[in-house]
Swiss-Prot record:
Entry's localization field: Cellular thylakoid membrane
Protein name: Photosystem II reaction center X protein
Function: Involved in the binding and/or turnover of quinones at the Q(B) site of Photosystem II.
Species: Prochlorococcus marinus (strain AS9601)
Keyword annotations of the record: Membrane, Photosynthesis, Photosystem II, Thylakoid, Transmembrane, Transmembrane helix
Subunit organization: PSII consists of a core antenna complex that captures photons, and an electron transfer chain that converts photonic excitation into a charge separation. PSII forms dimeric complexes.
Domain of life: Bacteria
Pfam families the UniProt entry points to: PsbX
Amino acid sequence: MFQISNLLIAADFSAEVANNSAVGMIGSFIAAALLIVVPATAFLIFVSQKDSLDRTSTGRR
């Protein structure tokens, strides 16, 4: 751990750069959730509900 902290100090990273990187990472997570996870979840719920309705309607025949 000591070597990593020395490397960061020696590389002269600023707090602003670290902050911008963290904000970008969080923004990427949010974008991924909005673009991939939410539509996939909605689609799977839709298919699951439709399949459930199909099974109950065929069971009544």
